[in-house]
Amino acid sequence: MALVRWGLKRQNFHPLRRRRRALLLKLTVVIISVLLFCEYFIYYLVLFRCHWPEVKTLAHGGRQEPVLKAMFLADTHLLGEIRGHWLDKLRREWQMERAFQTALWLLQPEVVFILGDIFDEGKWSSDQAWADDVQRFQRMFRHDSHVQLKVVIGNHDVGFHYQMSKYRIKRFEKVFGSERLLSLKGVNFVMVNSVAMEGDGCIICSEEEAELREISRKLNCSQEVPGSSQCDREPEPRLPLSAPVLLQHYPLYRASDANCSGEDAAPPEERNVPFEEKYDVLSREASQKLLWWLRPRLVLSGHTHSACEVLHPGGAPEVSVPSFSWRNRNNPSFIMGSLTSRDYALSKCYLPFEDTVLTMYGAAAGFLMILILVHFEHLPSPFLCGWKLCRLHMRR
């Protein structure tokens, strides 16, 4: 009898072990599938819908005018060692890395501009912390040699005006370069250190304004007929005949975001809050200087973390680019630009929404709970009967 009982127990034990293994396999498959989709494949699914805008091209000498494909993003705010929790770093930096690498692979831009505040603590970080942040940035925003990556100075990178120092600016420029003027495929870009546009005559501010006046002179020379002025005596070749695209961190002066609209504009309760000059936006005087000196055909800026489109006096349009990070908004995005020397077209590309990903994780957690409860038959009888009927129907 003892042998018979032992045999029956052993027979009952094997099906139980098989059921546990089946449950473990189901849970593993669901968890891995959800992780792969939410942390990897969703970026391809969402960014696959983005396309380069069409721009009118003119023929010169029997050849079509070249089109430059440029990406513009802003305010990545990589967290530092002081305010950055490790889980916050891991989550938000992985999101930006996957979004950027997917965009490079799918869209293949020729140049990428980041409009300031790439770091969150550059204004007070030590040299070692700065080196660590730079290393993380270079890993996240790695790119092939045929893609150019240009970065504009932001207030979190070197500090607000009264925190800014020559040392911090040199530290930034040592990594990201100091060029203010860039010409690609006949398109002129002017990258401004808008933190230095305080207008109080400080040494850094005076040097920045002097450099911008020199750029203004070069742009004016490009519009003159060769042989008709002193510009011909310049040792450097002339710039392409093209009104520049102005890139900076602070927006040009505007009273508020009251006239901004769209799903990624500032929340309605914040749009009528007046902006503070030299903190939220550039001062009126600094804005007028930039528009007068450079006469841009397009201005792109960051800083506010929200989208806005403004038409400035003289007809210069400005586009404020929203933050690229989930840390600053639920629906981050970037701008795609197709540019020629005479024309341009812009479109916006949204990244996966953070609440969508969190909802998917919540739904997956609920499904896992149901699997576990069904396995141990802890569901109320109506749910259990319904589950068994579904399984029976699926087998047929």
UniProtKB/Swiss-Prot annotation:
The keyword Transmembrane applies. It is found in: Endoplasmic reticulum-Golgi intermediate compartment membrane. SUPFAM superfamilies: Metallo-dependent phosphatases (SSF56300). Keywords: ER-Golgi transport, GPI-anchor biosynthesis, Hydrolase, Manganese, Membrane, Metal-binding, Transmembrane, Transmembrane helix, Transport. It is an enzyme of class 3 (hydrolase). GO terms for molecular function: GPI-mannose ethanolamine phosphate phosphodiesterase activity; manganese ion binding. It is a multi-pass membrane protein. Its cofactor is Mn(2+). Binds 2 manganese ions per subunit. The chain crosses the membrane at residues 28-48, 356-376. It holds the Pfam family Metallophos. It comes from the Eukaryota. A divalent metal cation 2 binds at D75, D117, H249, H305. Its EC number is 3.1.-.-. GO terms for biological process: endoplasmic reticulum to Golgi vesicle-mediated transport; GPI anchor biosynthetic process. Belongs to the metallophosphoesterase superfamily. MPPE1 family. Interacts with GPI-anchor proteins (via the GPI portion). Interacts with TMED10. This is Metallophosphoesterase 1. It comes from Mus musculus (Mouse). The lineage of its organism: Eukaryota, Metazoa, Chordata, Craniata, Vertebrata. The gene is Mppe1.
